[in-house]
Structures are given as C-alpha cells and as structure tokens.
Amino acid sequence: MKFKVNGHEVFASTGGRPFDKKKPLIIFVHGSGLTHMTWVLQTRYFAFHGYNSLAVDLPGHGLSSGESLKSIEEMADWVSDVIDAVGHKEASLVGHSQGCLVTVECTSRYPNKIKTLSLMGGAGAIPMNPELLSLAENNDPKAVDLMMDWAHGPAGHFGGHPVPGLYHINTGTMLAKSRTIENTLGVDFRACDNYKNGFEAAKKIKCPTLSILATDDKMCPVKEGKKLASLIDGSQVDIIDNCGHMMLLEEADRVLTVLKKFITT
C-alpha cells in the first residue's frame, strides 16, 4: 500500500489484505536500517483477523521515498502523521529496537491517538558502540555484518527459519543492505545514540503496554527492557528464552502468540 505523508510517498505492507478504514489499525515500526519485511510473520495474522496491519517503511527506507529522518522525535511525529494520513483517529503501535524508541516517544506525545503499545527488544536508551556507528556512517558493509551477528542469539546463528531455505542472518543482511548504509543505518544509529528522552517519555504513557524481551539479547538486554517497563504504569512483561534481539524473526510464532493475546483481549 502506498500513500503520502508530508509530501513523500510511503510504503506499508498490509499483510496481504486490502486496507479497510472500518477496521482497527495496527502500525508496526521497524528497527535501525531495516524495512517492513521484518514484520512479515506477524502482520499477516492480524490482517486476516479483523485488523488493518500497516508495517511501514520509515522515510528513506525500503520502498518509502524521501530522506531518512535524523531524530527519534521526528520519527515519532511521522508515525502520528501516518495515522492521520490513512484516515484513522487512533492506532495500536508495535515497535522493535529503534522502533521502540520511536513508539514510546510517539505515545508520550500523542496519548489520545495510541490505543495500545507493544515493545520488542526495547530499552529507554540505545547508546551505540562507537566503532559500529563509525562503520555505518562511513558506508562500510561490515556495520551490517556486525549488527546481524550481535542481533541474533545462538540458535539464530544456526538456522531455524520458518521458511525452508532461508537463513535468519542472511535475510536480515539483505534487508539492511537494500539501501545505502550511510543514509539508512548510519542515520538511524546516530538518531538512537542522540536520543535521551526515553525514560521521561515512558513515565507519561498511560495506555496498555506490553514489553517482549529475550534472554539472549545483546543489543537491548533484559535488564534494560525491564527498567523501561518499570516506568510505564501497568506494563506487562514477557520474556522469551533462548532468543536474541531479532525475536520477531527468530521466534516469530512465540512472539505472535504473546502479541495477539495482548492486542485482541
């Protein structure tokens, strides 16, 4: 599905079903340097069970036009604009990694527009490794290779992809290298490194919130996810064992089970 936000064309996957303004809206926000494709194993379920699923490509990513937004705050405002652009007054938000920073900030800024908030592999702050940041900003493909190595748990390194013939790390690498690294991953990493408002934003959130964390997450460890969740009144926490930061791909079925129980009840 394509539509315009602030004069630029936006692409969003609808999970294989036509968009219907009468159905409740769920917006999925991807992590640094990635695209809507990371959500392919979650969006389809909701699209076929009474929801509008929109897995968006952030500006400058995937199939969306424009330049990458340079701050988490800009991205948060953009998500709010997406809700308006598709003719809805509210949405449930689902974010992964950087997408958690974006959706936390968005929910704190626009509380009347957010019905529920689901965070995967989230933290209140995501300071970047200086070497990784430098590699990404200098368009070095090693940045993607390192990110994918750290982002997957031990099991994710050995296979287990639900689609026969695919490999978790190669799939993620392909997505991250689909656009110029310095203009996507480099910009996103810098935005994460600069963002300092996550904990204060979390304190303002009043809508039902779910945090899905993973025991083998090296990028946003469980303790950081719990710290963020503790600041959100009534936040639910679910921890997935033997899984890394890319839980939405490594353990797609387990993540979907938790997510659909939270959103649909």
Question: Can you describe what each PLM-predicted range is?
Answer:
Residues 22-31:
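Short beta-strand element of the alpha/beta-hydrolase
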Residues 134-204:
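Conserved alpha/beta-hydrolase catalytic His-Asp/Glu region
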Residues 101-146:
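Flexible "cap/lid" loop of the alpha/beta hydrolase fold
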Residues 31-34, 97:
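Active-site glycine-rich loops that stabilize anionic/oxyanionic intermediates
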